[in-house]
Structure formats: C-alpha cells, structure tokens
C-alpha cells in the first residue's frame, strides 16, 4: 500500500510497427511475421493485451481503491510535411496508430475508426460481449507516456521501416525546421508541449511523463 501509482503495459502501442520483430516480442510476446497477416495478428494480440490491462486495473482497485492505475504510451507526434491536403490526412491517419491503444484504455471501448478499419481489411478480431464489459470497467486513471521526438510524414515519400526503432513510418521524412541527434532523432522540445495539449484535449485525464 506504500505504492499508489501503477501502470499496466509499457509502451503498449510500439507494436503498431508490426513489421519490426522486436515490438511483437517486447509488447505481446509474439512473432507477427509467423502469421498470414502480421497486422491482423498484431491487433488480435493487442486486443488480449487491452483486456488484460483492463482486468489489472479492476483488480488493482479491489486491492486498494486509492490506487491510481494508468497506461504507458510511446508518443511520437506526427506533423504533416506540407499544407497539401494529402499530407494533412496522412498525418491524421497515422496519429490513429499513436492513439489506438490509448483510446481503448481511456474510453473503455474501441474507436469507430478502428472498427471500420477492421471491417475494410477483413480482420477478424474476436471482441466478445464480456470483453466489452471488461474494457468499459477497466479504464485507466491517468496517461503515462514517453516522449523523445516528433515525426514528419510526406504522402509522396515511401521507405523501408523493418529495422527502425525511432517511431517513424514508411512515409517519414526529415523536418527541415528541426535539428537531429547524431543518430537521427528529432530534437523537438515544442513537440512535448504539443503532445501534452493533444493528450489533455482528447482525454481530459492527468498526464505523467514517464520517459523523456
């Protein structure tokens, strides 16, 4: 009872880069490449992880109602490279990948954009009525997150990300207004302010910077 603040899964959303094997292993203990659809496999594993997180929150509250139990999200905010509408929409869509796990953990249900994406891609994610109940009853009290860099996307650019660990996407490009570290990570303190505002506007929950 001396420890009052808890988190369930560390950087649970890193596995959205299902192409890089390290994230399947570290987030869900799975090798998504073994499946016909690595992306579908990631969402299936992610669903069970979300249910487990919600159950942990509920059990923690039963142990001690004073516990504050949060999630832990790796947040790399996405900027559009230009004012081209295609870049704006791409950045918005890629932010869905950043928010997906947090949306479920904070709101207690799957967002409409995710359910529509499952339908369009023919993904079979077995979300039972019991799962829905568990998710609704096990929302987190606060948002824990890491912030190291921002990312910029260009709808006209495509690259290989199978070995990347910097939170980038296949559409990532260098931001001409931001300096980088020696290993290519954007040095963007304004991005942290942007992230804090974005999180609070979306969820209105307390925020905890866990890694920076």
Residue spans of the language-model regions?
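Active-site region of glycoside hydrolase catalytic domains
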Residues: 1-212
């Amino acid at each position: 009872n001396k420890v009052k603040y808890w988190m369930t899964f560390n950087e649970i959303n890193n596995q959205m880069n299902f192409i890089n094997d390290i994230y399947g292993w570290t987030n869900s203990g799975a090798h998504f490449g073994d499946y016909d659809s690595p992306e579908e496999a990631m969402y299936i594993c992610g669903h069970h992880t979300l249910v487990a997180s919600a159950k942990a929150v509920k059990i923690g509250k039963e142990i001690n109602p004073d516990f504050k139990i949060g999630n832990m999200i790796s947040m790399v905010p996405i900027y559009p490279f230009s004012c081209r509408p295609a870049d704006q929409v791409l950045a918005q869509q890629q932010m869905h990948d950043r928010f997906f796990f947090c949306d479920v953990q904070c709101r207690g249900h799957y967002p409409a954009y995710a359910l529509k994406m499952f339908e369009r891609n023919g993904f079979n994610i077995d979300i039972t009525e019991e799962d829905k109940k568990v998710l609704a009853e096990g929302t987190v009290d606060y948002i824990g997150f890491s912030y190291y860099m921002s990312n910029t996307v260009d709808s006209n650019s495509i690259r290989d990300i199978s070995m990347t660990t910097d939170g980038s996407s296949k559409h990532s490009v260098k931001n001409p207004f931001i300096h980088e570290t020696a290993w290519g990570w954007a040095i963007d303190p304004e991005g942290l302010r942007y992230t804090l505002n974005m999180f609070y506007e979306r969820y209105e929950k307390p925020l905890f910077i866990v890694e920076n």
